[in-house]
């Protein structure tokens, strides 16, 4: 998910949790 990729770049683990 492109949105999740942005979260991973900034939040790391939070991005994985928000993988939608």
Swiss-Prot record:
What modifications follow translation? Glycosylated.
Intrachain disulfide bonds? none
**Would the keyword Phosphoprotein be found if you checked this record's keyword annotation?**
no
Primary location group: secreted
One Gene Ontology term from the biological process aspect of the record: acute-phase response
> What keywords tag this UniProt record?
Acute phase, Calcium, Disulfide bond, Glycoprotein, Secreted
Subcellular localization is given as:
Secreted
Residue ranges occupied by any Pentraxin (PTX) domain in the UniProt entry: 1-20
Q: Does the keyword rRNA-binding apply?
A: no
Coiled-coil annotation reads none
GO CC annotation, single: extracellular region
Name the family the entry cites.
Belongs to the pentraxin family.
Task of the protein: Displays several functions associated with host defense: it promotes agglutination, bacterial capsular swelling, phagocytosis, and complement fixation through its calcium-dependent binding to phosphorylcholine.
Q: How does this protein assemble?
A: Homodimer; disulfide-linked. It is not known if it assembles into a pentraxin (or pentaxin) structure. Pentraxins have a discoid arrangement of 5 non-covalently bound subunits.
Instruction: Identify this protein by name.
Output: C-reactive protein
Organism of this sequence: Mustelus canis (Smooth dogfish)
């Amino acid at each position: 998910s492109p949105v999740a990729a942005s979260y991973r770049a900034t939040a790391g683990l939070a991005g994985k949790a928000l993988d939608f």
